[in-house]
Amino acid sequence: MAEEFVQQRLANNKVTIFVKFTCPFCRNALDILNKFSFKRGAYEIVDIKEFKPENELRDYFEQITGGRTVPRIFFGKTSIGGYSDLLEIDNMDALGDILLSIGVLRTC
């Protein structure tokens, strides 16, 4: 069930972030991503509260990404990790280029 929940959200080539809105690391990751202007439908925020039991979802995250914590961030079906991974990419000034290369940003 967790696999289906996650894979349905990763079906399109987009940026998907699984969060808990009470988590400060999730809010920080959203702040980084919200600096960019995404094409319609190219960015999805998924509150993990939508899935019960949450532990099953976290177990699946661990199976496919190596981590149970949120945020879990995907570019297409590829996990880039969590907040610290996103922050590292952003601090290298590479995030915008990556997002452009996968075609999720507005270019005008």
UniProtKB/Swiss-Prot annotation:
<keyword id="KW-0676">Redox-active center</keyword>
<comment type="similarity">
    <text>Belongs to the glutaredoxin family.</text>
</comment>
<keyword id="KW-1015">Disulfide bond</keyword>
<dbReference type="InterPro" id="IPR036249">
    <property type="entry name" value="Thioredoxin-like_sf"/>
</dbReference>
<dbReference type="GO" id="GO:0044423">
    <property type="term" value="C:virion component"/>
</dbReference>
<keyword id="KW-0249">Electron transport</keyword>
<dbReference type="GO" id="GO:0015038">
    <property type="term" value="F:glutathione disulfide oxidoreductase activity"/>
</dbReference>
<keyword id="KW-0946">Virion</keyword>
<feature type="disulfide bond" description="Redox-active">
    <location>
        <begin position="23"/>
        <end position="26"/>
    </location>
</feature>
<comment type="function">
    <text>Displays thioltransferase and dehydroascorbate reductase activities.</text>
</comment>
<protein>
    <recommendedName>
        <fullName>Glutaredoxin-1</fullName>
    </recommendedName>
</protein>
<dbReference type="InterPro" id="IPR011899">
    <property type="entry name" value="Glutaredoxin_euk/vir"/>
</dbReference>
<dbReference type="InterPro" id="IPR047185">
    <property type="entry name" value="GLRX1"/>
</dbReference>
<dbReference type="InterPro" id="IPR011767">
    <property type="entry name" value="GLR_AS"/>
</dbReference>
<keyword id="KW-0813">Transport</keyword>
<dbReference type="InterPro" id="IPR014025">
    <property type="entry name" value="Glutaredoxin_subgr"/>
</dbReference>
<dbReference type="InterPro" id="IPR002109">
    <property type="entry name" value="Glutaredoxin"/>
</dbReference>
<dbReference type="Pfam" id="PF00462">
    <property type="entry name" value="Glutaredoxin"/>
</dbReference>
<feature type="domain" description="Glutaredoxin">
    <location>
        <begin position="3"/>
        <end position="106"/>
    </location>
</feature>
